[in-house]
């Protein structure tokens, strides 16, 4: 007997494999966790009670790690954060051996962040439990794209026909890639803008409109998403100086006037104030949804953990 599941994927490794209706299903699932997080005196559910969630972050993180930890704990999971700095990885253990070790411990969920593109897929191929990609190199960051989509839908009520401008360091941003894929699947028109040194070659193949002038890119835009300069991934020479970058590509109050009157300003964090975005814009609650993105992140990750666990139980025939 074959099972028909609303979300038939064993892992969540990227947005690219998902159909639009599957993305919308995850957004709908997240809505009930938004309600729980906002309304409940005790923010706790037993959906993952008795299950073990391991967060293995091979790359530094604050928001994403905390968000996944809170999400797992609110669902009742036993959450373990793997201290990579003190692990056998630092002693030369291969990624595959690490994956086999984690699998032998019978973890029920693995949340992985890694600096190498494709590393999370490599781990997923070696383990029995669901794997969630918390960001791999310059490849994808699916839960960030999902929480961004959730934020946009809650503010705008739709995706079809929206003009979304993604601005900044597109070259090194896995967030940009996942957001582009998700938003286009959902019917939005995506523009990208940045200096030519920070725009990946052939990105037009993803269906985006490319700009090198911020004013033109955000003109009439419904959503403006700013990205930080990922200097930790740069060898140098990508921009002349932070001052010049801000002058050309920093979002100011004056530049924001070029966008739609009800423009939504977003940023995945962390912010570099005075570089890609001015404080006056980031802190303006009329336009800025940056804090709301953080809130939606917990609910969205709760939904992903819950959905993948339910899918596994259905396939395994567990009660």
Curated annotation (Swiss-Prot):
GO CC terms: cytosol
Swiss-Prot/TrEMBL keywords: Pyrimidine biosynthesis, Transferase
UniProt: L-aspartate binding residues: 91, 174, 228
Main enzyme class: transferase
EC numbers for this chain: 2.1.3.2
Pathway: Pyrimidine metabolism; UMP biosynthesis via de novo pathway; (S)-dihydroorotate from bicarbonate: step 2/3
Catalytic activity: carbamoyl phosphate + L-aspartate = N-carbamoyl-L-aspartate + phosphate + H(+)
GO biological process: 'de novo' pyrimidine nucleobase biosynthetic process; 'de novo' UMP biosynthetic process; amino acid metabolic process
Positions contributing to carbamoyl phosphate binding: 63-64, 113, 141, 144, 269-270
GO-annotated molecular function: amino acid binding; aspartate carbamoyltransferase activity
PANTHER family hit by this protein: ASPARTATE CARBAMOYLTRANSFERASE, ORNITHINE CARBAMOYLTRANSFERASE, MITOCHONDRIAL
General function of this protein: Catalyzes the condensation of carbamoyl phosphate and aspartate to form carbamoyl aspartate and inorganic phosphate, the committed step in the de novo pyrimidine nucleotide biosynthesis pathway.
Family: Belongs to the aspartate/ornithine carbamoyltransferase superfamily. ATCase family.
Subunit (UniProt): Heterododecamer (2C3:3R2) of six catalytic PyrB chains organized as two trimers (C3), and six regulatory PyrI chains organized as three dimers (R2).
UniProt name for this protein: Aspartate carbamoyltransferase catalytic subunit
Source organism: Zymomonas mobilis subsp. mobilis (strain ATCC 31821 / ZM4 / CP4)
Upper taxonomic lineage: Bacteria, Pseudomonadati, Pseudomonadota, Alphaproteobacteria, Sphingomonadales
Gene designation: pyrB
């Amino acid at each position: 007997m074959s099972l028909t599941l609303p979300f038939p994927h064993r892992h969540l490794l990227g947005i690219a494999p998902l159909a639009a209706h599957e993305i919308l299903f995850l957004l709908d699932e997240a809505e009930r966790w938004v309600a729980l997080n906002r309304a409940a005196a005790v923010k706790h559910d037993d959906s993952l009670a008795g299950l073990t969630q391991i967060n293995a972050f091979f790359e530094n993180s604050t928001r994403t790690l905390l968000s996944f930890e809170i999400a797992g704990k609110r669902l009742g999971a036993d959450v373990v954060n793997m201290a990579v700095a003190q692990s056998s990885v630092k002693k030369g253990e291969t990624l595959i051996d690490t994956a086999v070790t984690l699998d032998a411990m019978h973890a029920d969920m693995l949340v992985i962040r890694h600096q190498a593109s494709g590393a999370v897929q490599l781990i997923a191929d070696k383990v029995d439990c669901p794997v969630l990609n918390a960001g791999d190199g310059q490849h994808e960051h699916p839960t960030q794209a999902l929480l961004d989509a959730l934020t946009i839908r809650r503010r705008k009520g739709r995706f079809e026909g929206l003009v979304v401008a993604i601005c900044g360091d597109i070259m090194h941003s896995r967030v940009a890639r996942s957001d582009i894929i998700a938003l286009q699947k959902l019917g939005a028109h995506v523009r990208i803008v940045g200096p030519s040194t920070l725009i990946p070659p052939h990105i037009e193949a993803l269906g985006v409109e490319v700009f090198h002038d911020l004013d033109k890119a955000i003109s009439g835009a419904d959503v403006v998403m700013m990205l930080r300069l990922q200097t930790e991934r740069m060898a140098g020479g990508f921009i002349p100086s932070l001052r010049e970058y801000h002058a050309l590509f920093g979002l100011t109050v004056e530049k924001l006037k070029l966008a739609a009157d009800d423009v939504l300003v977003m940023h995945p964090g962390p912010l570099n104030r005075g570089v890609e975005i001015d404080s006056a814009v980031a802190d303006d609650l009329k336009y800025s949804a940056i804090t709301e993105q953080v809130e939606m992140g917990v609910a969205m990750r709760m939904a992903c953990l819950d959905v993948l666990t339910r899918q596994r139980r259905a396939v395994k025939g567990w009660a």
